[in-house]
Swiss-Prot record:
One of its GO terms (molecular function) is ADP binding. InterPro entries: Kinase-pyrophosphorylase, P-loop_NTPase, PPDK_reg. SUPFAM superfamilies: P-loop containing nucleoside triphosphate hydrolases (SSF52540). ADP binds at G158, V159, S160, R161, T162, S163, K164, T165. The keyword Metal-binding does not apply. HAMAP family: PDRP. This is Putative pyruvate, phosphate dikinase regulatory protein. Belongs to the pyruvate, phosphate/water dikinase regulatory protein family. PDRP subfamily.
Length: 280
């Protein structure tokens, strides 16, 4: 990233407060954050905040922060109200990730919630598998560590702007361990890619015109000239041709993501893998 882009990049401080481990809140916030690739997010997690004293310590740490969104999962109402009061007094945004669901279920059923901290962790191994898959997707996003390719259930390949990261997180929510690799011109393909069962590899592609428009809009969002090598049609066609050549060499399944939602692309991947339990 150029210095100019760094200076213009918007930054949001995401504060995650929970009276349990905070994984639920973190995953929900992260699922929203990935929709903003041009924004830098600074995450701060505060788990096991089970009383007012601990909450006040959190407040003292974050009071000087700017551009803050506080996301919280707190069972007890007095802690919830304390967070809301603090956020309003310090001009911070906030979102209560739990109360809306609990209150609406109560309204529909008349049943009283048990107000048990960390109750979600009694959901069984399926819950922990999902959390593990989400952590795996984050750890091995953008080819950060090639060893992840050998451990993954699915490996996504694709040029820039083919939805690799949001797809990884969506599939992780299906308990699949997903790693992805951006295909960058003149960049070495890790040896591990050639050692993977081709059925586990998904090659993502896009229509050149769609990719051109997406990349141009991204450059405009950065306040930069949209007519660059990155968005040039000749460069895009060369990237897509190189990717197609690699996909043929690997013998992997290829999906054109143009005009497809993340859910539609994920459904094709699950079908290819022979997974039809969409509630997994």
């Amino acid at each position: 990233m150029t210095e100019e882009k760094k200076e213009n990049q918007k930054i949001v401080n995401l504060i995650i407060i929970s009276d349990s481990v905070g994984d639920t809140a973190f995953n929900m916030v992260q699922a929203g954050a990935v929709q903003y690739p041009n924004v830098k997010f600074n995450y701060r997690r505060y788990p096991f905040i089970t009383n007012r004293e601990k909450l006040e310590k959190v407040f003292s740490e974050i009071t000087e922060f700017e551009n803050v969104l506080i996301a919280f999962t707190l069972i007890h109402e007095d802690e919830q109200l304390a967070v809301i009061k603090f956020a309003r007094e310090h001009n911070m945004k906030y979102v209560d990730l739990l109360s809306g669901v609990i209150d609406n279920i109560h309204a529909l059923t008349g049943e009283e919630p048990k107000h048990e901290i960390g109750a979600v962790h009694h959901m069984g191994q399926n819950y922990f598998d999902r959390i593990s898959a989400m952590e795996f997707a984050v750890m091995y996003d953008d080819g950060k560590d090639p060893k992840g390719f050998l451990e993954a259930d699915v490996v996504l390949l694709g040029v820039s702007r083919t939805s690799k990261t949001p797809l990884s997180l969506f599939l992780a929510n299906k308990n699949l361990k997903v790693a992805n690799l951006p295909l960058v011109p003149q960049t070495h393909i890790p040896d591990e890619i050639y050692k993977i069962n081709p059925k586990k590899i998904i090659g993502l592609t896009n229509d050149p015109s769609v990719l051109n428009e997406i990349r141009r809009q991204r450059m405009i969002a950065y306040g930069l000239n949209p007519d660059t090598t990155y968005s040039n049609m000749d460069s895009i066609n060369a990237e897509l041709e190189a990717a197609d050549k690699l996909y043929k060499k690997l013998g992997c399944y290829v999906i054109n993501v143009a005009h497809r939602s993340i859910e539609e692309t994920a459904a094709l991947i699950l079908e290819h893998l022979g997974i039809d339990d969409y509630a997994k």
